[in-house]
């Protein structure tokens, strides 16, 4: 020390020489306190002068003790006291130091504290070594003296760069718990030393537990005081109980002492210093522990080649390694379960002991605490009852003391609800039971509580009362300070509850797979190719023929005329299509198509029903007025008188082919001159799309003798919600031979009820015989002139007039073999709707009718 102190004048002289270039003496004095001179002292000077001064300081070895002071307030290293220099040396990071292992307890200590270690731990067991000299002055003598008492563990070289410890945490821990510090001593890299027994980190924690690890409550008052010091809450009485409950007393059995983590707090050291000494047996056990495969982990340590002597709940080794250890009497899982059961029983006993001790301590204190509780929260009186050791409660059981198992129920709501809730105390060991789920870390919480010997609590401090600033607790951590949003919140909650309770999603029909593609058509789109399927489609449905004698009102035939672009209902279920007699009183013209037994197959397509979606956009055509609707109804009333003439003459000539079947298909007006009819596939989907309805005419085909097109156009209106149901809509449909105008009629959705558009409304038509011979399909030719205003088949060449749809989009209509004569339905029988909606028809001169090859059609009045 004298030689190092003699360097201080040299340091000041060098500093004075370096700062002599400066004119201000104060700045020169400031550099005395610094290891490197401040650049502020060299203002206006070249950098070389500062570098020279810095080199001058660095070349001179600064005194280590002064270097601790020179950092000033900005130093990053903890300074040690001078009194502890004999323990740590001058500069613990760079000094020579020696580690010794106590032969009694295998504790790794410095030689400087070996004497105090023997006095504290072992009493008069081992003769204390003479007080060590400082390692800087005489390291060899102290080393030789220590060798007689303990085996030398390691020696580190004194190099300024090599750090002696892998874990610098242990350096800092030496100041707080000196005799428990674990140094992973390594042999020196520079010079070989005495052979070093490897001190593995797995073994050292076993040796750390003091004999006071099994801290029984010697005096209950000291326990309460220590608990109050640790809990540090303003209301002292209520929080006391939980820390006392949670403090686990660690028994001295080898299973419990084994699994610690290295460092024990200094509370035990203080007890040892105060004189609470116990016997030396735990330490003899630690050094003389024998491996028991039924109690210990047993996995071989690769360094020491010895089996691990931690308990069965060892956290260092995996479960598979522990199961693979040979020599156990039972299976590892059974032993582990028994071990846990024993530990639980011990914990139950310890808690009972703690509860009885706290009951003795706190009867006087619990009185005012309960009074304050009764005054503040208005709860019922305390119930100090002891039902079972598992549910025994202290006198002030009103206080919420949830463990980690039921820590959700907090006592903060007591201020708002007006009473303090009393959560049920979980059965003792509930903390452990909640942690037993994992395979690997089964008894984590129990082991940690065994390792720690200090008082602790598993939750944050919970005050008895706090200021809520006039707020209300609406939810967990959700406080409301006013009532502005109460009604809105209530309405929203009720809406959500109604929606959840009504289960609206169950009422929406599932979308079945449809063979029809789904064109997301724009409003001005013409007929999509996906809607009209050719007859060569192999998925066309052929239903068996069934004779019907029924009155077919035209409401069956009109419903799918002009509602939406691709929304068709074709039901393949013949049992659902069995309604035979339907007649509406508002219908003026009714068709009665008698079906007799006919041998030839007849093609009938199920009527495509249309579900009008309520969100259809209004069409671009002008909406017609209600007077036009009335005009339609008057015209439909006139039609049966005109129908009586020519269909009856046609029935007389074609009476031989008496069987007739009704084929309803969509004949698109957009197809223009070459009007073709198609049979839709029987799909099972109810698909509704928002699109312009281009199909405004229905053709009722008699498969014996051709086509009697019941083609009619609905008049577009904004929302044609007709009050009479489908019967009133029928008034707008021509019963026989409607004009098939070639302009696209974009009609908005008809606001019909779902019942009117259900499959039941199409039963009678779809139950008709459905069969089709592919070889019979022909294109119909023009058989009469337009001067007579008869049915004129529109030729494919006239498609150039409209140019809206290529002819390939439409399917050819079957023409039976025996349809020889073409019957004509008169000009007056067609319901010319072209006058009712002028904007919906592009060319009124094209109001032509298809050639009718009718079978027997009787028109009933």
From Swiss-Prot:
InterPro entries per record: Ataxin-7-like_regulator (IPR052237), SCA7_dom (IPR013243)
Q: Where is the composition biased (Low complexity)?
A: 372-381, 403-417, 606-616, 648-671, 783-794, 829-847
What residues form the membrane-spanning segments? none
Residue ranges occupied by any SCA7 domain in the UniProt entry: 284-351
Disordered: region residues: 1-31, 154-189, 342-448, 606-673, 772-861
Q: Where is the composition biased (Basic and acidic residues)?
A: 342-354, 628-641
| Polar residues bias spans | 355-369, 817-828
PROSITE patterns in the record: SCA7 (PS51505)
In what ranges is there compositional bias, type Basic residues? 617-627
The entry's protein name is: Ataxin-7-like protein 1
Organism of this sequence:
Homo sapiens (Human)
Q: What is the gene called? A: ATXN7L1
């Amino acid at each position: 020390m004298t030689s190092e102190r003699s360097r201080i004048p040299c340091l000041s002289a060098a500093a004075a020489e370096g700062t002599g270039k400066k004119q201000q003496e104060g700045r020169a004095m400031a550099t005395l306190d610094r290891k490197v001179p401040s650049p502020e002292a060299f203002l206006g000077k070249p950098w070389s002068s500062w570098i020279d001064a810095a080199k001058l300081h660095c070349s001179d070895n600064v005194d280590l003790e002064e270097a601790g002071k020179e950092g000033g307030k900005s130093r990053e290293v903890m300074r040690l006291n001078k009194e502890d220099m004999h323990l740590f040396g001058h500069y613990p990071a760079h000094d020579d130091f020696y580690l010794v292992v106590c032969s009694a307890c295998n504790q790794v200590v410095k030689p400087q504290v070996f004497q105090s270690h023997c006095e504290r731990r072992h009493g008069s067991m081992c003769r204390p070594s003479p007080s060590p000299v400082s390692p800087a002055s005489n390291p060899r003598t102290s080393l030789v003296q220590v060798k007689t008492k303990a085996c030398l563990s390691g020696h580190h070289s004194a190099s300024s760069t090599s750090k002696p410890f892998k874990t610098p945490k242990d350096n800092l821990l030496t100041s707080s718990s000196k005799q428990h510090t674990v140094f992973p001593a390594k042999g020196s890299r520079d010079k070989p030393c005495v052979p070093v027994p490897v001190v593995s980190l797995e073994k050292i924690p076993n040796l750390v537990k003091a004999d006071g690890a099994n801290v029984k409550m010697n005096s209950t008052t000291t326990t309460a005081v220590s608990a109050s010091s640790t809990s540090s809450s303003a209301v002292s009485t209520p929080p006391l109980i939980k820390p006392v409950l949670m403090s686990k007393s660690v028994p001295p059995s080898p299973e419990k002492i084994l699994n610690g983590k290295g460092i024990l707090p200094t509370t035990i050291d203080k007890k040892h210093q105060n004189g609470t000494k116990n016997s030396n047996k735990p330490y003899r056990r630690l050094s003389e522990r024998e491996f028991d495969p039924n109690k210990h982990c047993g996995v071989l340590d690769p360094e020491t080649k010895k089996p691990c002597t931690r308990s069965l709940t060892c956290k260092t080794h995996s479960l598979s390694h522990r199961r693979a250890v040979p020599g156990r009497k039972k299976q590892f899982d059974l032993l582990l379960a028994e071990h846990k059961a024993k530990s639980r029983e011990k914990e139950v006993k310890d808690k009972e002991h703690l509860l009885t001790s706290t009951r003795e301590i706190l009867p006087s204190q619990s009185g005012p605490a309960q009074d304050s509780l009764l005054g503040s929260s208005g709860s019922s009186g305390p119930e100090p009852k002891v039902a079972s050791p598992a549910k025994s409660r202290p006198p002030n059981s009103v206080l919420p003391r949830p463990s980690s198992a039921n820590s959700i129920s907090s006592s903060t709501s007591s201020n708002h609800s007006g009473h303090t809730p009393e959560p049920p105390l979980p059965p003792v060991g509930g903390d452990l039971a909640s942690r037993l789920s994992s395979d690997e870390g089964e008894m984590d919480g129990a082991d940690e509580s065994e390792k720690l010997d200090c008082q602790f609590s598993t939750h944050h401090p919970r005050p008895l009362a706090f200021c809520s600033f006039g707020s209300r607790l609406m939810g967990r951590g959700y406080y409301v300070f006013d009532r502005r949003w109460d009604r809105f919140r209530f309405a929203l909650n009720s809406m959500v509850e109604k929606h959840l309770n009504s289960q609206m999603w169950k009422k929406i029909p599932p979308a079945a797979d449809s063979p029809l593609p789904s064109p997301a058509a724009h409003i001005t789109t013409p007929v999509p190719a996906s809607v009209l399927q050719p007859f060569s489609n192999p998925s066309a449905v052929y239903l068996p023929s069934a004779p019907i004698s029924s009155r077919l009102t035209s409401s069956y035939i009109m419903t799918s005329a002009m509602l939406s672009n691709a929304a068709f209902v074709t039901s393949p279920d013949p049992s659902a299509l069995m309604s035979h007699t339907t007649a509406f009183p508002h219908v003026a013209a009714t068709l009665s198509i008698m079906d007799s037994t006919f041998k030839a197959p007849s093609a009938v397509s199920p009527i495509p029903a249309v579900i009008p979606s309520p969100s259809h956009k209004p069409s671009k055509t002008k909406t017609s007025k209600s007077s036009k609707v009335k005009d339609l109804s008057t015209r439909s009333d006139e039609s049966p008188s005109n129908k009586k003439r020519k269909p009856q003459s046609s029935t007389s000539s074609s009476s031989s082919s008496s069987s007739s079947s009704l084929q309803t298909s969509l004949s698109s007006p957009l197809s223009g001159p070459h009007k073709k009819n198609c049979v839709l596939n029987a799909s099972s989907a109810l698909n509704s799309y928002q699109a312009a309805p281009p199909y405004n005419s229905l053709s009722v085909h008699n498969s014996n003798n051709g086509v009697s097109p019941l083609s009619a156009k609905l008049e577009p209106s904004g929302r044609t919600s007709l009050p009479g149901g489908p019967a009133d809509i029928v008034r707008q449909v021509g019963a026989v031979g409607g004009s098939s105008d070639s302009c696209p009629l974009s009609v908005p959705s008809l606001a019909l009820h779902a019942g009117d558009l259900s499959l039941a409304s199409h039963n009678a038509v779809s139950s008709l015989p459905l069969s089709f011979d592919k070889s019979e399909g022909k294109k119909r030719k023009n058989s009469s002139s337009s001067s007579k205003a008869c049915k004129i088949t529109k030729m494919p060449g006239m498609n150039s007039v409209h140019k809206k749809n290529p002819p390939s989009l439409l399917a050819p209509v079957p023409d039976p073999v025996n349809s020889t004569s073409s019957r004509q339905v008169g000009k007056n029988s067609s319901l010319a709707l072209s006058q009712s909606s002028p904007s919906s028809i592009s060319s009124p001169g094209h109001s032509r009718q298809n050639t009718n090859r009718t079978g027997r059609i009787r028109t009933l009045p």
